[in-house]
Amino acid sequence: MKILVLNSGSSSIKFQLFLMEENRSIASGIVEQIGSENSRAVLKANSKEYEKKRAIKDHHEGLDVMNELFRESNTLHDLSELDGIGHRIVHGGESFFSSMIVDDSVIAKIEQISPLAPLHNPGHIAGIKNAMQSSGDVPHVVVFDTVFHQTMPEYAYRYALPYDICKEHHIRKYGFHGTSHRYVCKRAASLMGMEFQNFNAISLHLGNGASACAVQNGKSIDTSMGLSPLEGLIMGTRSGDMDPAVVVYLLNIGVLKWDEIDTFLNKKSGLFGICGSSDMRDVVTRMANDERAKLAFEMFCYRVKKYIGAYYAVLGHVDALIFTGGIGENAPNTRQKICDDLKHLGIHVNHDLNFSKERGERCLDDKNAKIKTFVIPTNEELEIAIETMRVIKERAKI
């Protein structure tokens, strides 16, 4: 069974082809700078790289070039050969509680909630429509980053703002990175020999974007990101949690203008705002001689630690703490700082295991730990492929 996963942005298409009998990627690539003269498409397969450079005017043409690369690499001759195509969708709003087979009504709902994700959902829609035109009768499935968090209770997702306004305008915590949190929690449960529906965990997706998730009995019951990915942890360029009155104050004294707020909070804050770098590797390198870099590191780790404590209190019993994402997987200094002084919670990270050069899925805790600590490399594309296959098979039973 072959499943193609597409992540269509406003000017790019990321893609990965999976052989589902082995849960194995057999080809991956990207079509980038769509709509410019400098468009480029790259595919990696069979330990080789295939590339085409030429102007690509739109997503339809981008998919045509992707097809050319598939044929050239002999991994796929036509999209109609596929058993399914899975599409990553950033925001499902309150309309979607599970992954869905795509039809006209699904596309219409995604278009309707695009104001909640104006930078992402329009590109997703363009990818879906063009892929459907190019793939014959192949079923398409949409997999939402927000769906995993739809199991949060209302007292966790509702904001303490005027209730009627929030209901009318769909203002609430939605959460993101759901596909990643679900994947790594499923893997950790499997490594512990536990059924996912009995598994409790605190999942930390730490990268340029970062979020925490409390998982109880295999379901998300709270997460740090909110209406947008801006809430919660300190990130590369995003502020995370802050007093909203800061923005009002800066507007009142003339430091900010209304049209500068989004850029200020999303692109000029976080690690970058504190020390001038959004890259945790650079921050760690500079810490010894740069007080601001040290401050950024300590603020980042402190914020994560606070969320661990909060989610421990909410969950009561925790089976595992999971690190994933670029920082979570590759920054032992950050993991160590976060886990230091958490022994009273049962989290004991072994220093040598944490700083080992070993990669891939691994356990970091020592013999005194009551809570397992894992590093699990995320694989959102594989999780989307698995979800796509599940939805298609369920439809076939009807």
UniProtKB/Swiss-Prot annotation:
ATP binds at K14, H205, L206, G207, N208, G209, D279, M280, R281, G326, I327, G328, E329, N330. Mg(2+). Can also accept Mn(2+). It is found in: Cytoplasm. Pathway: Metabolic intermediate biosynthesis; acetyl-CoA biosynthesis; acetyl-CoA from acetate: step 1/2. Its cofactor is Mg(2+); Mn(2+). Its EC number is 2.7.2.1. One of its GO terms (molecular function) is magnesium ion binding. PROSITE patterns: ACETATE_KINASE_1, ACETATE_KINASE_2. Mg(2+) binds at N7, E380. The record marks H177, R238 as: Transition state stabilizer. It comes from the Bacteria. It catalyses: acetate + ATP = acetyl phosphate + ADP. One of its GO terms (cellular component) is cytoplasm. The active site is at D145 (proton donor/acceptor). The keyword ATP-binding applies. GO terms for biological process: acetate metabolic process; acetyl-CoA biosynthetic process. InterPro entries: Ac/propionate_kinase (IPR004372), Aliphatic_acid_kin_short-chain (IPR000890), Aliphatic_acid_kinase_CS (IPR023865), ATPase_NBD (IPR043129). Keywords: ATP-binding, Cytoplasm, Kinase, Magnesium, Metal-binding, Nucleotide-binding, Transferase. Homodimer. Catalyzes the formation of acetyl phosphate from acetate and ATP. Can also catalyze the reverse reaction. Belongs to the acetokinase family. This is Acetate kinase. The lineage of its organism: Bacteria, Pseudomonadati, Campylobacterota, Epsilonproteobacteria, Campylobacterales. The gene is ackA.
